[in-house]
Structures are given as C-alpha cells and as structure tokens.
C-alpha cells in the first residue's frame, strides 16, 4: 500500500545493533515508531546540499516537500512494515543511490533518538572550526557526517549515515573507518562512534548499527552555541517564511508560549487521496526559539507535561520541536 506520512500510523522496523569488531553477534531489535516520529526526523534532517542555494521564497518548505516526496515515493507499506516500492524500479542506479542516501539520513535521525537518546544531530558541514574554517574534510578517508549531542551528559557522538539497496559489509567498514578517525570533540572523547545503515532485506526496509572503538587523532573544535544555532536554523527559517501569516497561530502549552505552523503540502503520488489535492503538517516550537535564538535546554524540564497536553496524536522531541495531527484555527481536527 501507498505510504502517506501525514496519516496516523505505527510502523515496525528490524534494527540490528552490533558492537565494535566482527566477532560480536548482533542484537536484533523490533523498533516501533509513529508517522509523527518519522516526520520529526525528516523535518530536522538538514542536508548539506541546502548550503549551495541562497535563500528564496519558501525555500525551506520546498526542501521539506522534496524530502517528504522522496520518502513516500520510495516506500510502500505491508501491514506495519515498510518495504521498497516498485515505483522506483525504473530509475537509474545513481538516482536510486541518491534516494537510499536520503532514507539513510532520515532513519539515522529517527534511530539515534529512539535507541540512543540523542537529542541533537547535525551534519558537520554546517560547522566551522575556531578559526572560522569550514570542515570540508576532517580525515584521510572522508569527512565524518553527523555530530550528535546529549545535553544531560554534555556528551558528543559521531555518526555515519549510510543508505544502501543491500546489506553491504563494505559500506559498514568504510563508515567505521571514517568514524574511527575522530579522537575528540571540543576536547572530549565521543561517548559513541557508530554507523547506521538502512538497506532492504527481501524487500523490507531494515537498519544496522555498528559501533566503532578505534580512537583516531583528529579533534573537532567548534562552539556549542553555534552548533545548537545551526541545528535550529532550518526550522527557524521555515517558521519565518510564514511569520504573521494565517497559517500560524500562537498557543500556550504548560505556561510556555508556542508558535504552531499549519503547513500545507501536496499529495505527491497518484492514489494517495481520492478527493483532496493537499494535506497539512502541523509543526510547533517555543516562540523564544524563533525570535531570540536562545538556549533551548530549559524546555527539557517540561517535556512530560507538554507531551500530556499535546496528546497521543503527536510527537515532541527533546529539542522542543513537535509534530502533531493537523488542527485548524478553531482547534478542530483536519480530516
């Protein structure tokens, strides 16, 4: 069946976790997640290609629509499981590789939050070192892709996101080699270095995680404040594209001022909807995050209260960004 990530649904996915080294027997996990959790991962996954283009009207909405269209076009559902869609079978191998790369990133963002409590994940391309130089390359093999941060432990992690059609040992080995080159982030040893790869097994989408124990001699040095600012940059710009428009509303949750954006997006595939040409994604974040770029960590003290107030048809990340079932301005559900 067709995937529509704006429709409320719980999915399942087999994830294999492997420790460092080849002798470790993997631990299989049946990961459950909702469409809202996956939407949150797609929303917060800011890919480096966006840095190529200057700002233009509705740039961030265009990016989000593109990412959403790729995910929905590439995948079908079989009950609660996601599988490879025959729609992409005619594509050139390079085009398929590009789609696999995007899926690998989307699900790495989802999995690191679900299984490793990583609140923040950002591509290294967005960061600059203490001298203001971009991290175009940080090692012999290739630039390491993703830097994770956990506020409670004040800990950094290194992640390589891979997306493949098959379970490729070579891709995992290359990812481990890349991650292993990093010795420290801002003077601290990473608490975790790992590769997360999505692939298809008998047509079903699976994921594999392999940890890396090697300690390289490369150090990454950047401002934590700049890291957090860059993490929220694409979401802030999405909200600012619609600021003071009728698509936005103010609301107060647990005594905190939020701004909620009702973002219309098209149905991309024939058959996704028999009547409508458009649906909505409802995204919210604290007003202070948008207007003043202030440190967001205080929001974590209110997470449980906020989750109760938002209800079941939603997902609130530890980053303070939520996705929920679309509501109109009278607080009535869009159906």
Identify the function of each model-found stretch:
Residues 1-31:
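N-terminal alpha-helical "arm" segments
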Residues 31-111:
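Interdomain/boundary linker segments immediately adjacent to catalytic/signaling cores
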Residues 109, 163-226:
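Catalytic cores of nucleic-acid endonucleases
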Residues 113-120, 149-155, 185-189:
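Secondary-structure boundary elements
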Residues 114-138:
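A short acidic/basic microdomain associated with nuclease active sites
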Residues 140-144:
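Short, surface-exposed coil-to-beta transition loops
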Residues 145-150, 154-167:
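Conserved catalytic cores of phosphodiester-cleaving nucleases, focusing on short active-site segments
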Residues 211-335:
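Extended, charged low-complexity segments
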């Amino acid at each position: 069946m067709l995937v529509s990530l704006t429709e409320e649904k719980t999915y399942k996915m087999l994830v294999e976790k492997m420790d460092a080294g080849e002798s470790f027997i993997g631990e299989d996990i049946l990961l459950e997640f909702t469409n809202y959790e996956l939407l949150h991962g797609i929303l917060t996954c800011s890919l480096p290609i966006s840095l190529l283009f200057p700002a233009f009207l509705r740039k961030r909405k265009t990016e989000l629509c593109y990412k959403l269209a790729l995910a929905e076009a590439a995948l079908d559902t079989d009950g609660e499981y996601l599988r490879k869609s025959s729609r992409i079978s005619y594509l050139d191998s390079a085009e398929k590789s590009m789609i696999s790369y995007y899926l690998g990133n989307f699900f790495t963002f989802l999995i690191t939050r679900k299984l490793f409590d990583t609140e923040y994940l950002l591509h290294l391309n967005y960061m600059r070192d203490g001298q203001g130089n971009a991290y175009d390359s940080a090692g012999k093999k290739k630039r390491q892709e993703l830097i994770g941060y956990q506020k409670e432990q004040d800990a950094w992690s290194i992640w390589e996101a891979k997306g493949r059609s098959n379970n490729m040992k070579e891709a995992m080995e290359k990812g481990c080699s890349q991650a292993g080159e990093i010795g420290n982030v801002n003077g601290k040893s990473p608490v975790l270095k790992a590769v997360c790869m999505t692939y298809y097994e008998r047509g079903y989408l699976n994921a594999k995680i392999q940890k890396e124990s090697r300690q390289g001699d490369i150090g990454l040095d950047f401002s934590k404040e700049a890291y957090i600012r860059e993490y929220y940059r694409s979401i802030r710009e999405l909200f600012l594209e619609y600021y003071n428009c009728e698509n936005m509303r103010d609301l107060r949750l647990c005594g905190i001022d939020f701004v909620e954006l009702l973002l219309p997006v098209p149905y991309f595939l024939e058959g996704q909807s028999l009547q409508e040409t458009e649906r909505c994604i409802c995204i919210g974040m604290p007003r202070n995050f948008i207007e003043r770029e202030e440190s967001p960590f205080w929001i974590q003290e209110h997470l449980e209260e906020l989750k109760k107030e938002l209800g079941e048809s939603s997902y609130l990340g530890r980053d303070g960004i939520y996705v929920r079932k679309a509501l109109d301005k009278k607080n009535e559900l869009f159906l």
